[in-house]
Amino acid sequence: MSSQAIYRIYGLRVRSDLPLPVASISDDGEVDLIVRRGGAVPRPVAPQPPGMALDWQEVDQGWLLRYHTRTDEVLEFAYNRDASQLEIRSTTPEMTDDITALLVGAGLATALHLRGVPVLHASAIVVDGEAILVAGAAGAGKSTLTAALVAKGAPLLAEDLAVLTFGENGITVQAGYPRLRLCPDATLIAGRAAPDLPRVFSGFVPDDKRWVEATTLPGGFRTTPAPLGGIYLLAPRRPERETPAIEPLPPHRAGLALLDHLYGTRWLRIPKVKALEWCARIAGRTPVRVVHAPPGLERVKETAEAIVADVRSFSQEVTEGTES
């Protein structure tokens, strides 16, 4: 039997026989989720998909999240009804690095969804003790900008999933894992050369991204939750943009904009009423901004500086308003 360890990630205490990219913690007997590696599954006889296919369905024992690649590899995350147990099955069980990369993303996000926890597809860094989220459409530069912020000295809190907890005194963002996944050219933002860095995926996913350890960067990694202080949504880049610009959104527009950044809204089939409720609560208690960034990798640090300055400007306004 494989050895198991206990980890705290996204606010969950996870017992897993698959090593997770966070430090293990002491076992006091309390566990929210048990992760086990199951047996190998046969390759499907169905036609190969043109790319990575994702299937989410209810099954007799609970729920099944299934990946099917164009090379006919399969990865399954099987959840019981209350998402307290997760079994992982694959045609390539030896690809533990690939499986782990998907587990700490979609695998755990799905478990949180089944538990009714809101998750934004966003990174989180910490500025002056508050969690600042960065979200954007695919290719908008979210991870690259996050790397620039951590390289500038802001601790990383979560790389791709902003797991939220609603409380009486505000919203809290849970800590994820201390890694960034970056495209090869973007690793230079973190002062690293791509050939020297491990690949996120070794073959299961056709992806050339690399892991960068946040603990090797000036900002490092924050292991504890932080109160949500602001959300920055990246607008599509325009070639004519010369300097960063940051636009505040009123709560009603912010709530609608956040709908596009709830994790797995479409394939997890989150009820629209629930999605609207979550986004309205977030927007009603949190400043939401749109970031118009100039194009070019060489301008990313400039955008990072503009965001930090905006966060501190807003925090100062709140402090002055409270004192008056």
Model-derived segments and their meaning:
Residues K142:
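Conserved lysine of the Walker
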Residues L145-T146:
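Post-Walker A alpha-helix
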Residues S2-P19, A23-S24, V127-A137, A151-F314:
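Glycine-rich, often acidic-flanked micro-motifs
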Residues Y67-A131:
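Extreme N-terminal, non-catalytic leader segments
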Residues M1-M95, I307-R312:
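Long, basic/Gly/Ser/Thr-rich N-terminal segments
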Residues Q316-S324:
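Short, low-complexity, charge-dense intrinsically disordered segments
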Residues G116-H121, V290-A293, S324:
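Short glycine-rich, low-complexity/disordered patches
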